[in-house]
A protein has these predicted regions:
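A cross-kingdom feature strongest in bacterial/archaeal respiratory oxidoreductases
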Residues: 1-79, 86-89, 93-97, 105-209
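Nucleotide-sugar-dependent glycosyltransferase catalytic core
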Residues: 101
């Protein structure tokens, strides 16, 4: 069984097809999200509405290990509740211990008791790993270097119509060196089919030297 809180596996996971196929095979999937995501209807048995993080208090721990608590910008819409409150009620209904918190601050203090500005146990130390990189043999095949556009990165910005109209939300393309385009028999502005595992996409070719 899986409980998904604020995640859309078909868009957020490294291997979306593998993730969604695993969810389809699960005995139970509960998806908690502010949005009725069409893909979730294919694998989720239960959809529970929760408030987005902008309408809830909570705490983030960033990559530096810095603790960042925040308040909701506005109150949740209608009877919507923050995710932590929905989890608390589920715990109460199942008769589980440790689900009696009255605020997100109580949750934070229990998870990180006595924490100051930084979370304990987080650092950038490299342990038990060699610091010498092994040089790999040259390969004749191409290596894909991809990025996630800034306005594709989470459920909130993906649904912001104004942000999707910006230059940073342009449709992804395949950018190759002019020599590579010629060697592959492609043309600038033409289409090329890109595959990854069982997934594929038809993308426009651009030159990038």
């Amino acid at each position: 069984a899986y409980i998904l809180l604020g995640v859309e596996p078909d868009l957020d996971c490294h291997n979306p097809l593998l993730a969604t196929e695993a969810l389809k095979q699960a005995s139970l999937v509960v998806a908690m999200s502010p949005y009725k995501h069409s893909a979730a209807l294919e694998y989720a048995d239960v959809l529970l509405p929760v408030a987005p993080f902008t309408e809830s208090s909570g705490t983030f721990v960033n990559a530096e290990g810095r603790i960042q608590s925040f308040n909701g910008v506005v109150r949740p819409l209608g009877d919507t509740r923050p995710g932590w409150k929905v989890l608390r009620v589920l715990g109460n209904l199942l008769g589980l211990a440790g689900f009696d918190h009255e605020s997100s601050e109580q949750v934070r203090d229990e998870v990180m008791p006595g924490a100051g500005q930084f979370a304990d146990g987080l650092n950038n130390a490299i342990v038990d790993l060699p610091l010498v990189l092994e040089q790999s043999e040259p390969s004749a095949s191409l290596q894909r270097i991809a990025q996630v556009p800034i306005y594709f990165s989470d459920a909130l910005v993906r649904r912001a119509a104004s942000l999707q109209m910006t230059k940073d939300s342009a449709v992804p393309t395949v950018r190759l060196a002019a020599e590579t385009i010629e060697n592959l028999g492609l043309s600038v502005g033409g289409a090329v089919r890109v595959t990854q595992n069982a997934g594929q996409a038809l993308l426009e070719v651009e030159v990038d030297d």
